Regions:
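Bacterial N-terminal signal peptides that target proteins for export
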Residues: 2-12
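Bacterial N-terminal signal peptides
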Residues: 10-21
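Electrostatic cytochrome c docking/interface patches
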Residues: 43-78, 169
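Sec/Tat-exported extracytoplasmic proteins
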Residues: 80-81, 87, 129-133, 162-166
Length: 169
């Protein structure tokens, strides 16, 4: 209960800071053309830095996807993972916080996303966030989740669920 309260307060502070300052690390009105302000970040552009991309793409899930793990991932996504706050309850990138972010959160129901981005890349983002890196990699303001609020095992479960929203493999 206490950690959930602290996490939600931290989330509110971060979102509030973005709203009041109109900025954030790696956030902008998208001068590089990575997405349209208020629109989704371009799916074709990796969030993983170029010097780490091959390594991230090579990362494979440590266990197979099962219906039980998908259900656990969904429960985390909609609950203590707080993913729904930005990505929406259906994973469409339309959560309550999406309205105040300069770039819309990822729409996991877009099948092109699953086709272009690997599970390893998604885990990299869950571990490192998407804060941008001095013009090399654009950011969206997503904070690291795995290692901060979720275990790596739970991160894989959430990732499996997110990927399931884009249709079958």
């Amino acid at each position: 209960m206490h950690s959930c309260f602290v996490r939600n307060c931290a989330f509110a502070l971060v979102v509030g800071w973005f709203v009041t300052t109109g900025s954030g690390v790696g956030l902008s009105a998208d001068p590089a053309g990575y997405g349209q302000p208020g629109g989704e970040f371009d799916i074709r552009i990796p969030r993983v830095p170029p010097d780490q991309l091959a390594q991230a793409k090579a990362v494979k899930p440590p266990f197979p996807i099962t219906p039980e793990l998908l259900e656990e991932g969904k429960a985390i996504f909609l609950g203590r993972g707080t993913c729904f706050q930005c990505h929406g309850a259906e994973g469409k990138g339309n959560g309550g916080a999406a309205q105040i972010l300069p770039i819309q959160p990822r729409n996991f129901t877009n099948p092109l996303f699953k086709k272009l981005r690997t599970p390893g890349e998604m885990m990299w983002v869950l571990k490192n966030g998407s804060l941008g890196q001095s013009g090399r990699v654009p950011g969206t303001g997503m904070l690291p989740i795995v290692g901060q609020f979720l275990s790596e095992e739970d991160g894989w479960k959430v990732l499996f669920y997110e990927r399931s929203l884009g249709g079958s493999e």
